[in-house]
């Protein structure tokens, strides 16, 4: 590092070595140091004489970095311009990590902004609620005149910004995915005094236009402290603009990482975003690859000597307080369904159910009809109590469209347990004779609306999707996103690209044809699990009573005529957006052909819902493993299991569908269940409290619903807590969230049933292991119906069965 004769560092400020170390390491300065230091120094880059590609600072692992001691701050501060890893190819830390570190540093508020979207907003909101830290929402807009950072001044500001982002994405059509924003004047009109615009040094040439358009009261001068020599010049430019236009001034270090250890990944992402490698991009990166969250004392120490430095920090805290709000203030509802005069949604649902029930049960016994009447009355009472008639009418409308256009479909999921769903024609399994429990689908204790997935013959699913868009309007319906994250192959590829390796080597490592170098492996491990880009969910759609853009921005998908929200299914559920899954299924297309062929050649109309699920001929055929071509049970493992399981009832098929899957096979559940099923081994439970949940599967956990039931019975979880546990134990597990739930589970075990010690450990370990592979019983029920239907055609109409498959 260069030093002048007066012992001064960068920016001409006196700087002791201890102060330099404190600034670069991120540790809090002493009171004396904080009073005397006003600017940072930049560590000289390491010289590496190894041939390219050379190891980069990004390869430092979290475990290589010394653990920082708990930090406190005596200077209040809030960070208003930070990035999580949902700022694709920029942020190096998850939103949860950013929030936890902000809380640890004592920050009063945090803003995580993303480029042209709110991709991680819901995860940010949930994490901040857990840590009890104020949330500020905003975004960076890629305008023609530069990147404009906007902060929302409350829920109305959020809605307006989301609409603007949506309009910028959607007006470009299906093929140009770069959003296009209007000029500053139009943006200001859209904001209508509900945004703050951050004016930084990069926008100096547009300062007059921005202030003129938005008004000085809505523009804030943002001093960026990047801990680099250029800070002094940037701060001077911003403070001059503030003086010229009479603007409030705030300060930010625009962190793209939670801690110093995380910041090293940011350089690799920055290089990839610029289509360069680290060696060529390093000059444009901050020291150590990126900036990370700092507390008020550290920010104050890094500011150049200015008369109003303390005011800038105080302004930052004030703006954070003014802009803070929680996303639950924008909770949406389902759209209202148009019903005939004299009816409301509930009365029309009741009318429709009873009218259709008579036709659906016309061929059933009078004794069953009496049970059906009582069951439907009960279910309608529950639906009315929970105020869900609109949900059922929407699903019914989609199913009616399919049937009216000769598209075979059926409801999947726990809807198979509902007599109302069967009466409406949503499902094809009669639940009472099959012994299915309605409470598994809907109960007064349920948190949130029911979940009905609709399987549609795959060749015509697009018609159903476009029906939803046309019926409710493009502004009120959209598909759910799927966040593609780095897995091994993608992580290896991007890590090697960032490190400058040739494409041939990268391809070989990605294909596992050769082992990558250690430095590639280490960097790839940092990439794994991070968001890479958005894609489209297989069939999930959300429908809203207001423009969806009021809740979350919408953009075009790569697929023709598909628009997609910027959140995945979990984020949509957290925000209160109700998802409807329209899923393509090839077997339904085959069954449709079989039904048509029987009608054509035999003159018989086959209604799938009228088939007798107790037909012993079908179960005998399956028990002989005569199941080639039958849905879900024709694999080698299924054919080997069928003669051992000897299915005799419909529930046996439900178990067969769930049992022969990679998870239960690897988890060792198959043989114990079959032995218990055949009376070889006794049925046992780890604790008596598990019997209600596991009795029907002979003490062997098979279904996801059983996990939730165990949490309620054994640990006293509420229905909402149990569902939260199920989601937390899914594929995207958060260690911190799991730790909190583990404590709640152990506490609940002891308080509810006096369980502790080894038994508690066994239950928790089984829960966590089972959650990774447990198949939903609701889906098993629907798949089992397709097993039976396809087997029925195989037994009674083998020629039509074979042609239908072809």
Residue ranges and their predicted role:
Residues 115-120, 227-231, 256-259, 483-487, ...:
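Acidic, metal-coordinating catalytic cores used for nucleic-acid/nucleotide bond scission
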Residues 1-84, 98-109, 136, 140-225, ...:
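Conserved active-site carboxylates
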Residues 248-261, 411-414, 537:
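Short acidic/histidine-rich active-site segments
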Residues 77-86, 253-256, 538, 776-780:
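Histidine-centered catalytic micro-motifs
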Residues 13, 75, 108-112, 128-132, ...:
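Noncatalytic, beta-rich nucleic-acid-contacting surfaces in large DNA/RNA-processing enzymes
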Residues 125-128, 237-238, 264-269, 425-427, ...:
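Short secondary-structure boundary/capping segments
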Residues 91-95, 117-127, 230-237:
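Active-site-adjacent beta->alpha loops and helix N-cap segments on the catalytic face
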Residues 103, 129, 191, 215, ...:
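Anion (oxyanion) recognition and catalysis
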């Amino acid at each position: 590092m260069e030093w002048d004769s007066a012992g001064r560092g960068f920016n001409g400020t006196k700087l002791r070595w201890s102060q330099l170390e404190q600034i670069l390491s991120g540790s809090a300065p002493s009171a004396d140091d904080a009073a005397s230091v006003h600017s940072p120094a930049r560590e000289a880059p390491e010289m590496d004489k190894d041939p390219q590609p050379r190891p980069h600072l990004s390869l430092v692992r979290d475990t290589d970095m010394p653990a920082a001691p708990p930090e406190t701050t005596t200077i209040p501060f809030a960070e208003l311009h930070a990035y999580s890893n949902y700022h694709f190819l920029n942020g190096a830390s998850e939103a949860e990590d950013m929030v936890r570190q902000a809380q640890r540093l004592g920050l009063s508020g945090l803003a995580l902004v993303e480029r042209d979207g709110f991709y991680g907003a819901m995860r940010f909101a949930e994490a901040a609620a857990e840590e009890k830290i104020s949330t500020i929402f905003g975004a960076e807009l890629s305008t023609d005149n530069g990147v404009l950072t906007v902060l929302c001044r409350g829920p109305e500001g959020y809605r307006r910004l989301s609409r603007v982002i949506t309009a910028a994405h959607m007006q470009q059509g299906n093929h140009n995915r770069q959003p296009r924003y209007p000029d500053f004047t139009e943006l200001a009109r859209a904001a209508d005094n509900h945004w703050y615009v951050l004016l930084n040094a990069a926008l100096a040439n547009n300062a007059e236009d921005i202030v003129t358009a938005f008004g000085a009261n809505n523009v804030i001068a943002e001093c960026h402290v990047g801990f680099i020599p250029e800070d002094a010049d940037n701060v001077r430019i911003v403070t001059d603009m503030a003086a010229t236009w009479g603007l409030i001034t705030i300060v930010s270090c625009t962190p793209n990482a939670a801690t110093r250890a995380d910041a090293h990944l940011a350089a690799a992402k920055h290089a990839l975003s610029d289509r360069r490698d680290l060696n060529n991009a390093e000059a444009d990166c901050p020291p150590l690859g990126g900036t990370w969250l700092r507390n008020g004392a550290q920010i104050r120490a890094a500011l150049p000597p200015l008369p109003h430095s303390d005011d800038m920090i105080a302004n930052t805290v004030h703006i954070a307080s003014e802009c803070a709000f929680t996303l639950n203030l924008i909770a949406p509802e389902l759209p209202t369904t148009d019903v005939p005069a004299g009816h409301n949604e509930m009365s029309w649902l009741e009318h429709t159910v009873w009218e259709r029930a008579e036709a659906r049960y016309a061929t059933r016994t009078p004794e069953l009809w009496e049970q059906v009447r009582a069951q439907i009355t009960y279910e309608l009472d529950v639906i009315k109590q929970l105020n869900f008639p609109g949900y059922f009418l929407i699903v019914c409308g989609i199913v009616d469209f399919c049937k009216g256009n000769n598209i075979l479909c059926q409801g999947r999921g726990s809807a198979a347990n509902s007599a109302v769903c069967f009466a409406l024609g949503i499902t094809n399994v009669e639940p009472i004779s099959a012994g299915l429990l309605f409470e598994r689908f809907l109960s007064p204790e349920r948190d949130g609306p029911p979940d009905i997935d609709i399987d549609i013959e795959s060749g015509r699913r697009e018609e159903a999707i476009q029906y939803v868009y046309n019926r409710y309007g493009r502004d009120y319906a959209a598909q759910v996103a799927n966040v593609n994250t780095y897995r091994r192959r993608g992580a290896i590829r991007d890590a090697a690209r960032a490190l400058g390796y040739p494409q041939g080597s990268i391809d070989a490592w990605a294909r596992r044809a050769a082992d990558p170098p250690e430095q590639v492996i280490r960097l790839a491990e940092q990439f794994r699990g991070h968001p890479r880009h958005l894609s489209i969910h297989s069939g999930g759609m959300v429908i809203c009573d207001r423009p969806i853009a009021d809740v979350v921005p919408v953009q075009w998908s790569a697929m023709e005529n598909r628009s997609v929200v910027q959140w995945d299914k979990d984020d949509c559920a957290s925000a209160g957006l109700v998802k409807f899954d329209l899923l393509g299924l090839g077997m339904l297309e085959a069954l449709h052909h079989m039904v048509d062929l029987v009608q054509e050649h035999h003159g018989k109309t086959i209604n799938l819902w009228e088939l007798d699920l107790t037909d012993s001929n079908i179960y005998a055929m399956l028990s002989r493993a005569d199941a080639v071509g039958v849905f879900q049970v024709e694999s080698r493992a299924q054919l080997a299991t069928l003669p051992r399981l000897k299915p005799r009832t419909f529930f046996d098929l439900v178990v067969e569908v769930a049992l022969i899957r990679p998870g239960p096979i690897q988890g060792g559940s198959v043989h114990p269940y079959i032995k218990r099923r055949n009376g070889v081994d006794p049925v046992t439970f780890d604790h008596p409290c598990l019997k209600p949940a596991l009795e029907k599967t002979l003490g062997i956990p098979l279904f996801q619903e059983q996990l939730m039931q165990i949490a309620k019975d054994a640990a006293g979880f509420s229905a909402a807590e149990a569902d939260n546990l199920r989601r937390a134990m899914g594929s995207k597990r958060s260690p911190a969230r799991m730790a909190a739930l583990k404590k709640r589970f152990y506490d609940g075990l002891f308080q509810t049933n006096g369980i502790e010690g080894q038994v508690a450990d066994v239950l928790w370990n089984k829960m966590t292991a089972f959650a990774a592979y447990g198949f939903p019983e609701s889906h098993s029920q629907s798949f089992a119906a397709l097993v039976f239907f396809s087997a029925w055609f195989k037994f009674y109409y083998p020629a039509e069965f074979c042609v239908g498959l072809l």
